[in-house]
Amino acid sequence: MINIRDPNRLYNFYNEVTRLHMTCMPDWRVGQFWMNFLGWVQNEKKCDPFFPEESEMLTYLKEYCGEKEDING
């Protein structure tokens, strides 16, 4: 049997994403928000956005939104 991640983990992730989107960039469309953020992850963090787990993506997103210090220096 394949062990899968708990799907309920996504509620906290998306609630935090929604909070950051509504607080930091409320005028951006959803696609604009995600594409700009994912491009930033790839270009500034030199990280393929396909691979980070939710906790790492939230750390990046908080940094992108100006809520946290840079985790890479």
Model-derived features with residue positions:
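Catalytic phosphate/metal-binding cores of nucleic-acid and nucleotide-processing enzymes, i.e., regions
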Residues: 18, 34-35, 40
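Polar low-complexity intrinsically disordered regions
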Residues: 1, 33, 72-73
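A generic secondary-structure boundary signal that marks alpha-helix termini
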Residues: 26, 42-43
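Short, charged early-sequence alpha-helical segments and their helix-coil boundaries
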Residues: 43-73
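N-terminal acidic leader/helix
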Residues: 1-28
